[in-house]
């Protein structure tokens, strides 16, 4: 790939973006110059409506994106309020694994006192990376901050994958991996999880050997079932010739130590984290990742320079300043998760799975339709998650909320039996 510099001379100068040396060569007259005006004479692949001689706008879109299915996001309070005809405070939102307690009070104070919102943010998020280094015990040079972990997932794919190269996905899991692979023109090899949602490590090894995929995306605790990846399984996969991206969005609720520090030992490991769950900052979009130094250099080059907003960095710094609040909220959500699990076990048409996260996956049994259950609960003002995928069409996922949220959910469920 290169840069074509068109000036006043009848030739193109091509500057390679892969070298610091300027390289140029003359091309075979793809245009003519008349009175210092340049007219392109090369053919175009753009589609034309011949009846009107108008180029159609979608003809400029990359072909593989024309078939892309849109990601199905969760709706915020203001949209749900309009759709359901209920005030936001009358909606129990248990569909997106959000932290219902919100961020520490220091966050609101810091946002209200922002000094320089009119100045571009620090491209390197230096203050936040230093704070994360203290929080994690990993030096800041291994840490990169993004506009949510979702941005980092896409950035990793853009830096690692050429179009047509493959990733391994282990469904059921976070659907953003398959979505971003499609956006980046990559192939996806699905290695389904075992019935207990553990990884099929032997099958992963076979696929790595036969298909030569570039990277594998793993979530621990896994979304949507809340299972964790054992250390033995992770070590076996790290021995394979594949880049391992470990998504620890929910690690705080698991009681398991983060593997962020492992990136100093394993050149093929990336660990992703987020402020959305732990600190209640889902709406401000702040995530971060730990990378081997041999990899992070290239992500620094390729990322958008001002990707983390001033508000996002200010809020994240303020959240980290009150570690006790973060721990207390985490403990409250874990307690409520365990209480919710016990109550859901008593519902005759639900089979809940044990979880190490802030949500519980439930199989909908006894002939009840999972999608209809989700829709009926929504009419009552209670939002839970249902999936359209083949693996999960008979399941719903319920986030752990405040005790009063659980109480409302259980009262609604009792109306079905």
From Swiss-Prot:
Its EC number is 2.6.1.9. The modification N6-(pyridoxal phosphate)lysine is found at residue 277. Its main location: plastid. It is an enzyme of class 2 (transferase). It is found in: Plastid, Chloroplast. Homodimer. PANTHER family: HISTIDINOL-PHOSPHATE AMINOTRANSFERASE, HISTIDINOL-PHOSPHATE AMINOTRANSFERASE-RELATED. It comes from the Eukaryota. Pathway: Amino-acid biosynthesis; L-histidine biosynthesis; L-histidine from 5-phospho-alpha-D-ribose 1-diphosphate: step 7/9. Gene3D superfamilies: Aspartate Aminotransferase, domain 1 (3.90.1150.10), Type I PLP-dependent aspartate aminotransferase-like (Major domain) (3.40.640.10). It catalyses: L-histidinol phosphate + 2-oxoglutarate = 3-(imidazol-4-yl)-2-oxopropyl phosphate + L-glutamate. This is Histidinol-phosphate aminotransferase 1, chloroplastic. The modification N-acetylalanine is found at residue 41. InterPro entries: Aminotransferase_I/II_large, HisP_aminotrans, PyrdxlP-dep_Trfase, PyrdxlP-dep_Trfase_major, PyrdxlP-dep_Trfase_small. GO terms for molecular function: histidinol-phosphate transaminase activity; pyridoxal phosphate binding. Expressed in both vegetative and reproductive tissues. Keywords: Acetylation, Amino-acid biosynthesis, Aminotransferase, Chloroplast, Histidine biosynthesis, Plastid, Pyridoxal phosphate, Transferase, Transit peptide. Belongs to the class-II pyridoxal-phosphate-dependent aminotransferase family. Histidinol-phosphate aminotransferase subfamily. Residues 1-40 form a transit peptide. Its cofactor is pyridoxal 5'-phosphate. GO terms for cellular component: chloroplast. It holds the Pfam family Aminotran_1_2.
């Amino acid at each position: 790939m290169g840069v074509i510099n068109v000036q006043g001379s009848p030739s193109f100068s091509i500057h390679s973006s892969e070298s610091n040396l300027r390289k140029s060569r003359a091309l075979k007259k793809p245009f003519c110059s008349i009175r210092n005006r340049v007219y392109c004479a090369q053919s175009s692949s753009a589609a034309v409506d011949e009846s009107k001689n108008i180029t159609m706008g979608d003809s400029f879109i990359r072909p593989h994106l024309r078939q892309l299915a849109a990601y199905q996001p969760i709706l915020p309070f203001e949209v749900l309020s309009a759709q359901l005809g209920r005030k936001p405070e009358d909606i129990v939102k248990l569909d997106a694994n959000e932290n219902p307690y919100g961020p520490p009070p220091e966050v609101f104070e810091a946002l209200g006192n922002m000094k320089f919102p009119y100045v571009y943010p620090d491209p390197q998020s230096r203050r936040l990376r230093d704070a994360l280094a203290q929080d994690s015990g990993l030096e800041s040079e291994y840490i990169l901050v993004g506009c949510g972990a979702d941005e980092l997932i896409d950035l990793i794919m853009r830096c690692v994958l050429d179009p047509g190269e493959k990733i391994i996905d282990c469904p059921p899991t976070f659907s953003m991996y398959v979505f971003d692979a499609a956006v980046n023109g990559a192939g996806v090899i699905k290695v389904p999880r075992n019935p207990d949602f553990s990884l099929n490590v032997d099958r992963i090894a076979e696929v790595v050997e036969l298909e030569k995929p570039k990277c594998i995306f793993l979530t621990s605790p896994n979304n949507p079932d809340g299972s964790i990846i054992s250390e033995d399984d992770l070590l076996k996969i790290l021995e394979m010739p594949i880049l391992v991206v470990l998504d620890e969005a929910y690690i705080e609720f698991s009681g398991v130590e983060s593997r962020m520090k492992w990136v100093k030992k394993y050149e093929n490991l990336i660990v992703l984290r987020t402020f959305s769950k732990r600190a209640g900052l889902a709406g401000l979009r702040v995530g971060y990742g730990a990378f081997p130094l041999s990899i992070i250099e290239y992500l620094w080059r390729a990322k958008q320079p001002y990707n983390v907003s001033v508000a996002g960095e200010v809020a994240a710094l303020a959240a980290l300043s009150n570690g006790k609040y973060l721990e207390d909220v985490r403990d409250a959500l874990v307690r409520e998760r365990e209480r919710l699990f016990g109550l859901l076990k008593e519902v005759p048409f639900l089979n809940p799975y044990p979880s190490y996260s802030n949500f519980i996956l439930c199989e909908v049994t006894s002939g009840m339709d999972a999608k209809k259950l989700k829709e009926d609960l929504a009419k009552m003002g209670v939002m839970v998650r249902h999936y359209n995928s083949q693996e999960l069409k008979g399941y719903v996922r319920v986030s752990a909320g405040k005790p009063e949220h659980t109480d409302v959910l259980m009262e609604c469920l009792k109306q079905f039996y």
